[in-house]
Amino acid sequence: MATFSQKPTEVVKKWVIIDAENLVLGRLAAFVANRLRGKHKATFTPHVDDGDNVIVINADKIVLTGKKYTDKKYYWHTGYIGGIKERTARQILEGRFPERVVEKAVERMIPRGPLGRRQLRNLHVYAGSQNPHAAQQPEALDVGALNRKNKRIA
């Protein structure tokens, strides 16, 4: 029996929607990263984008455990000398684009490179419960019910 290798033309992508309200950030991000990569499928092939399209709603209601809400820092550099900047998770979640916390967590769990960037384009994160993907008829996934540690009441 030969090893199965999925071809890009044979890929069938599903649309799934996940409600992130009261879900632990890291556990949600790990689940979403596996879905985006296609590792949940028996047809997983490392060099082919055969993951699902994932929609995450209510990203502003995510939960961080411990003191990460106030202590976790996100760094970036402007490119100028001494231009290192930082923001806490609290500042981002209470700011203009709270969905970026989820996007960044998932991005850091996907391998870097051309394939990783293509897989990341299949992630759609929204701060509220509204999303423009009703036409895709996404299947709802309850990540909180998979394991009791996935959900925390804030």
Swiss-Prot record:
InterPro entries: Ribosomal_uL13, Ribosomal_uL13_bac-type, Ribosomal_uL13_sf. Keywords: Ribonucleoprotein, Ribosomal protein. Part of the 50S ribosomal subunit. GO terms for molecular function: mRNA binding; structural constituent of ribosome. The keyword Ribonucleoprotein applies. This is Large ribosomal subunit protein uL13. This protein is one of the early assembly proteins of the 50S ribosomal subunit, although it is not seen to bind rRNA by itself. It is important during the early stages of 50S assembly. NCBIfam families: rplM_bact. Belongs to the universal ribosomal protein uL13 family. GO terms for biological process: negative regulation of translation; translation. The keyword Ribosomal protein applies. It comes from Bartonella quintana (strain Toulouse). It holds the Pfam family Ribosomal_L13. HAMAP family: Ribosomal_uL13. One of its GO terms (cellular component) is cytosolic large ribosomal subunit. PANTHER family: LARGE RIBOSOMAL SUBUNIT PROTEIN UL13M (PTHR11545:SF2), RIBOSOMAL PROTEIN L13 (PTHR11545). It comes from the Bacteria.
